[in-house]
């Protein structure tokens, strides 16, 4: 729940997101590892068998129909598995888009091409003057039920307290 997130968050990672993307949001305290490039930030827990990740990315202005493909391209460019040839992708056929409170919510499955990894993701997409801002969370927990994990991650990327700095 958001109440739990308010008391168990990571101020340094939140400041990193605010500086790079202008977004004020709460990041779970366990998310400590990060990778950054110009329009992309990946924050994750360190557990190999219970990985929870948050990606913040900026997309160029594009129609809603192209968002999933654009997100997929950025993920494959920035997130790689243990094998050098493996990269993360969205299973595009699984992606569903709905709109709530002026923000688009994407859900579906992700997979690691070239590796036996995959799982659910949830993302919020907010149109901005420069294009679109994406907050995407995904889980890799092969031995665990993911329903509660994804509820927690959905709270991170989609709640009324996120400020997009507009």
Task: Indicate residue ranges for each PLM-predicted region.
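N-terminal "mature-domain start" segment
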Residues: 6-35, 158-160
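Surface-exposed amphipathic alpha-helical segments
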Residues: 1-4, 25, 31, 133-166
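Charge-rich, low-complexity N-terminal segments
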Residues: 1-9, 46-48
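Envelope-exposed proteins and targeting segments
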Residues: 21-23, 52, 121
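Signature of long, low-cysteine stretches enriched in small and polar/charged residues
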Residues: 79-131, 144-146, 158, 163
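Solvent-exposed loop and beta-edge segments used for protein-protein assembly and interaction
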Residues: 17-19, 48, 100, 129
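Charge-rich, low-complexity terminal tails
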Residues: 40, 44-62, 127-155
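Secretory pathway targeting signatures of secreted, lumenal, and periplasmic proteins
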Residues: 28-84
């Amino acid at each position: 729940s958001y109440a739990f997130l308010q008391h168990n968050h990571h101020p340094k990672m939140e400041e990193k997101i605010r500086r790079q993307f202008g977004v004020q949001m709460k990041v779970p305290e366990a998310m400590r590892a990060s990778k950054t490039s110009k329009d992309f930030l990946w924050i994750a827990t360190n557990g190999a068998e219970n990985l929870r990740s948050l990606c913040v990315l900026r997309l160029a202005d594009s129609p809603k129909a192209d968002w999933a493909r654009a997100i997929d391209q950025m993920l494959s460019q920035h997130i790689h598995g243990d094998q050098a040839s493996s990269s993360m992708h969205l299973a595009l056929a699984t992606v569903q888009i709905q709109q709530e409170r002026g923000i688009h919510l994407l859900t579906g499955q992700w997979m690691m091409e070239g590796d036996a990894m995959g799982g659910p993701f949830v993302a919020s997409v907010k149109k901005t003057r420069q294009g679109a801002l994406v907050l995407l969370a995904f889980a890799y927990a092969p031995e665990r039920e993911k329903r509660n994990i994804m509820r927690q991650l959905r709270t991170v990327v989609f709640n009324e307290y996120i400020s997009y700095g507009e």
